[in-house]
Amino acid sequence: MSGIYIHIPFCKQACHYCDFHFSTSLKKKDAMVLALAKEIVLRKEEFQDEIVETIYFGGGTPSILEVSDLSLLIDTVFSNYKVIENPEITVEANPDDLSKERIIELANHRVNRLSIGIQSFFEDDLKLMNRAHNSMEAKNCLEIATQYFENISIDLIYGIPGMSNEKWLQNIATALSFNIPHISSYALTVEPKTALHTFIQKGIIPKLDDEVAHEHFHLLVDKLEQIGFIHYELSNFGKPTYFSKNNSSYWLGKKYIGIGPSAHSYNGIYRSWNVSNNTMYLKSIAENKLPSETEILSKTDRYNEYIMTGLRTIWGVSLVRIEEEFGKTYLDYLMQQAQKFLLDDLLFIENEILKPTQKGKFLSDGIASDLFLLNLE
């Protein structure tokens, strides 16, 4: 089973923390939709032997498109690929785009999962992050969306300056009041060349506090696990049967094609990525050329990726797989590097699977980096 990711590189405005590829100009929107459809067709040979299980619209802001545009792209996938009968089709959306009419229209055009960028239910947080929606729109869209969609995920951000533990718990409680079956939650991070980075440098916004983010993370984990959510990936929580099939395929090393500017693809042997420039992308597709670069993954690259994705998920890192796929030298190296984390109760081994402990979960990315960064070839 495989997946198709379609990047919609447009947003109404730039969130202060975001460094993803997008444009706030919609002048090339129609041309982009046609180019995306054309790339889907141009790349069908890559997936001729694959069964498509998921279609995911990310961005940017996919909900900025007309539903007819999204429907055209979905139909193009169905016409050119082998797709299972009921694939998971996810559209990332912002609350300000989700009127009742738009929600009903999406539900009537094969979309069966919404991923809604709530981020916070508090007005001051939304203004600090320069989100396009307000608190009332966040609540209203969930009130309506839950009437038409069973499978909904929302994004929440923690570690926001001025966010107390009590305020964070209120955000979680508000989200749960809508009976949402999936929550993705991330610490606010400062990326170079973002407005947030500039504001912190100038002292307009206080520096982020890692300890606060750490506390918020554990409050979230404790609260959601108490009521039956499964913490199946570092930033993702789902009720049983509501895990994101699309994202799970990335973490489990399945093949996927990325369509659109800046989108990445992976087939188990090499990784490729499209140019992060809308004009260059459109020009290349118009010339029937794929605007991508390719990197063949070495054994060490694949080992490192497995360590990173494995430690972020409930599936962990299989020591048996490490030895079978990469060899005893890699396994010996892994066990040597892991010893200090095992002794510090940050990692544990169960049934030949290496996993982070509750204490180690928040630190899993840092732990993973200590387990790779090597070249044994």
Write out the residue ranges for each language-model feature.
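C-terminal scaffold of the Radical SAM
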Residues: 1, 22-45, 50-328
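Minor-groove-contacting beta-hairpin "wing" of winged helix-turn-helix DNA-binding domains
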Residues: 353-357
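Extended hydrophobic-aromatic, low-complexity segments
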Residues: 319-320, 332, 349
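Local cysteine-cluster metal-coordination motifs and their immediate loop/turn environment
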Residues: 9-20
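Short amphipathic alpha-helical interaction segments
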Residues: 328-342
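Short, amphipathic alpha-helical interaction segments positioned at domain boundaries
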Residues: 359-377
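A short, conserved structural fragment
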Residues: 342-352
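Immediate flanking context of iron-sulfur cluster ligation sites
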Residues: 1-8
